[in-house]
Swiss-Prot record:
Record-linked InterPro entries: Ald_DH/histidinol_DH, Ald_DH_C, Ald_DH_CS_GLU, Ald_DH_N, Aldehyde_DH_dom
Annotated knockout phenotype: The deletion mutant can grow on acetate and perillic acid, but lacks the ability to grow on beta-myrcene, limonene, perillyl alcohol and perillyl aldehyde.
Catalytic residues, chain numbering: 252 (proton acceptor), 286 (nucleophile)
Pathway recorded for this protein: Terpene metabolism; monoterpene degradation
Record site feature (Transition state stabilizer), residues: 155
Entry's induction text: By the monoterpene alpha-phellandrene, but not by acetate.
Taxonomic lineage from the root: Bacteria, Pseudomonadati, Pseudomonadota, Betaproteobacteria, Burkholderiales
Gene that encodes the chain: geoB
Residue runs in coiled coils: none
Protein name in UniProt: Geranial dehydrogenase
Record's catalysed reaction(s): (2E)-geranial + NAD(+) + H2O = geranate + NADH + 2 H(+); perillyl aldehyde + NAD(+) + H2O = perillate + NADH + 2 H(+)
């Protein structure tokens, strides 16, 4: 059964798009048609931005305090929760995320995130009186930045939408969302939840389409801030556009994270964590630790342990509960990953995988492990975004840190050791926005983001609300 959407959600209503073009959505595991949606044009995007601007002027939204916004966020969370299974299944069909992962990260985690920001909104301090050294008083306000243009990637389409929507709404902004063209069906489920929750018209608008309308959104005169998650190359283009406009932007971009395995590491713990820390979502996670740094004295042991684990992973349909690694999100991306694997066979020693799977249909690649990898090689330096691990030898902890930091990226990382305090000492030396000790899982109460070519700004945590606010000082002089 296919799902055919004819309308878009703009201004709190389901309206017919001006564009007559359509986009087909395929099942990543079977290549079968699962749905179609409008492919919107710039005129459709203009209507969405206008609706968001009207919401910023309307007392139904602009007139609410933090407690009022919190009530809307909680109702939205409840409506999303009722659609949890539908959301998870939708994502798994479209991008190949194993259903067990989608249940957690594209459903349960998203609901928790909305409720977390509802709590923050409820206790938000939006104005404070500060005494001046001159004897007067100044009111310092934190106002919403205005209309936010949010551009969403295909790898975690629900979670990364809510990473932006929840803090923006908590701050009092209105949002125009441009989902990835490959994962659109889930955005319709979120829009249905927003409608059921009774969010004021124009507070959230969803406009599906290609990169052209995304560019139009970024440079639109009615947009006050841009939030983007995606590739570093696209992020640079967006950063340049926002710089010309002096428009604030949050960018969460690529990564090539390192896992530093120390001499005293518990290898069993490392192996248990690999599906989350290194192969999550079939390797299609920006923070994945795909460079495994192993000490020379335990190098062969680490290689054998990882090879044994990865070779046993069940590869199959994303909706199969037994699947550990599903397909890539598209045929083009599968081909890109496969090219990197072929490149790697000339740069390093292939230990596991290296080819396509036995499936007749679907965009699958074999989980692959390379050993004897030089950190200067392309497979160690470029983001592959697939289930491909590179194991790199180091001679001492200083060299391990040096190798980990020798990357244009700096988003994630892990340190593996039975000495917790020492692991934290190593983590402090890593040039990256986030580091996990003996595992990796972003914390919704802590800022998430990268350094260097992995982006600018932070999402998650209370800090994220500040990204959607601007300061105003009111001098009380008489």
């Amino acid at each position: 059964m296919t799902i055919d959407h004819q309308h878009i959600f703009v201004g709190g209503q389901w309206i017919a798009p001006k564009s007559t073009q359509r986009s087909n959505i395929l099942n990543a595991s079977t290549e079968e048609l699962v749905g179609s949606v409008p492919k919107c044009n710039n005129e459709d995007m203009d209507r969405a931005v206008a609706a968001a601007r009207e919401a910023m002027r309307s007392l139904a939204w602009a007139g609410l305090d933090g407690k009022g916004r919190a009530q809307h966020l909680r109702r939205f969370a409840d409506a999303v929760e009722r659609r949890g299974q539908q959301l998870a299944r939708s994502v798994s069909l479209q991008n190949g995320m194993p259903i067990n992962v989608a249940d957690q990260l594209e459903s349960a985690f998203v609901v928790s995130l909305l409720r977390y920001y509802a709590s923050l909104a409820e206790n938000l301090v939006e104005e404070e009186a500060r005494p001046s050294p001159t004897g007067s008083t100044t009111l310092v306000r934190r106002d919403p930045v205005g209309v936010v243009g949010a551009i969403i990637p295909w790898n975690f389409p629900v979670a990364l939408s809510i990473f932006k929507i929840a803090p923006a709404l908590a701050a009092g902004c209105a949002v125009v969302v441009k989902p990835s063209s490959g994962t659109v069906l889930d955005s319709y489920v979120l829009a249905e939840a927003a409608a059921e929750a009774g969010l004021p018209p124009g507070v959230i608008n969803w406009v599906p389409g290609d990169r052209g309308i995304g560019s139009h959104l970024v440079s639109h005169p009615g947009v006050d801030k841009v939030a983007f998650t995606g590739s570093t190359s696209a992020g640079r283009i967006i950063a340049e556009a926002c710089a010309r406009l002096l428009r604030p932007v949050t960018l969460e971009l690529g990564g090539k994270s390192a896992a530093i395995v120390l001499e005293d590491a518990d290898l069993d713990a490392l192996i248990r964590s690999l599906p989350m820390s290194s192969v999550l979502n079939n390797g299609q996670a920006c923070f994945s630790c795909t460079r495994i740094l192993a000490p020379a004295g335990r190098y062969d042991e680490v290689v054998d342990a990882i090879a044994g684990a990865v070779s046993a992973y069940s590869v199959g349909d994303a909706l199969d509960r037994a699947t550990v690694v599903g397909p890539m999100a598209s045929a083009a991306h599968r081909d890109s990953v496969q090219r990197y694997i072929e490149l790697g066979t000339g740069e390093a020693r292939l230990v596991v995988g290296g080819g396509r799977t036995s499936q007749d249909r679907g965009w699958f690649v074999q989980p692959t492990v390379f050993a004897d990898v030089d950190n200067r090689s392309r497979i160690a330096r470029e983001e592959i975004f697939g289930p491909v691990l590179s194991i790199i030898r180091y001679e001492g902890e200083d060299e391990a840190v040096e190798i980990a930091n020798d990357s244009e990226y700096g988003l994630g990382g892990t340190v593996w050791s039975t000495d917790h305090d020492h692991a934290v000492t190593i983590a402090r030396r890593m040039e990256t926005g986030t580091v996990g000790i003996n595992g990796y899982m972003p914390d919704l109460n802590a800022p998430f983001g990268g350094v260097k070519s992995s982006g600018m700004g932070r999402e998650l945590g209370p800090e994220s609300i500040g990204a959607y606010q601007r300061y105003k000082s009111v001098y009380l002089l008489g």
